[in-house]
Amino acid sequence: MKKFLAFVMAASMALSLAACGGSTPASSTASTTTEATTEAAASGSKTDVAFVTDVGNIDDQSFNQYTWQGVQDFCSANSLNANYYRPTEDSDAARLEQMDNAVNDGAKAIVVAGYLFGSSIAEAQAKYPDIQFLALDVSTADLGDTAPTANTALITYKEEQAGYLAGYAAVTDGYKELGFLGGMAVPAVIRYGYGFVQGADAAAKELGVTDINIKYWYSGGFAATDEVKNKMDGWYSEGTEVVFACGGPVCQNCDAAAQANGGKMIGVDVDQSGQFDTVITSATKGLAESVNTALTDALNNGWKFTDAYAGKQTVLGAAENCVGLPMSTSKFTKFTQEQYDAMYAAIVDGSLVIDDSFDADVHPAVTNVTVDYQS
């Protein structure tokens, strides 16, 4: 876990960046970003590796920032030029436009993150067969009827493992009134939630308690709204102690409600302890490490993915040090590093198997916790 946590800690540093649009990218050949430039890197190209953001900015302290950090780290280590490109709007056309701009700037590889890129990747991979496309948190299903081609590598994560660790840790640490706030009921969010429930139930069994309650709700979207804020205010005021907030900006609503009511929150995807004071831990993905490993695979093979990644969806989890809890920044009072290490090792060696189902209508079986699934 040390290598994974190193990436998490490095990526948590805030980046002060200007948004970029059109064909003028922000440029970097190191781990800090400079102003846009037309100066070529040592490779002779203005852009070697491009990162196309989602509609958020590059300093979002979430997927964009951590994925970009991975691109920067890789390019810095290999004397390559990294640039990011921000779509002007939330549409497939805008995403494709920035991919076009990256190719025109000489990109050999284009990195994206998030299921919204499914359709644009499906089109771009055929349009640019010599460009390598690395898509994090994008599954084969997100590409619709189009299969990933040899120049496309899809990476998804075993969110259920990270969710399980978070739920187990929370109950072991003494929390009895828990909540799960999901955004849209997409597979990744569902796996986080179901893992959380399974982990909480496992800890309750070990402790021999049956008084653990979990409120569970999908907001239906990832935007911060008054509806979500009011819902979270209600939960905390009714006695909920900690909520696993899983859904991008909805975390802002959860944090505001937690602050107002003296509650706590569990972050998601990246270590959010530096963003929200209410966070006791975060269920994280090794975004930067994933980027580095996959791009190194392509670079070492003449800028072509090997069979390890080419034309397939690779699912990463604890065995690859790509999901977990950032224990160095966690605020547990009872749950220990030793307990975490033992649980993590059990997941890695297969002695602990976590259900990875993601049917929103089929809930995980539990024995020692009571789950209130709300609509």
Q: What annotation goes with each model-predicted range?
A:
Residues 16-19:
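C-terminal motif of bacterial Sec signal peptides marking the signal peptidase cleavage site
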Residues 27-375:
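A residue-level marker of the well-folded mature domains of exported/periplasmic proteins
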Residues 21-23:
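Bacterial signal peptide processing site
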Residues 11-12:
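Repetitive helical segments and hydrophobic/amphipathic motifs
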Residues 7, 25-26:
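Extreme N-terminal leader/targeting regions
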Residues 1-8:
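Positively charged n-region of N-terminal signal peptides that target proteins for export
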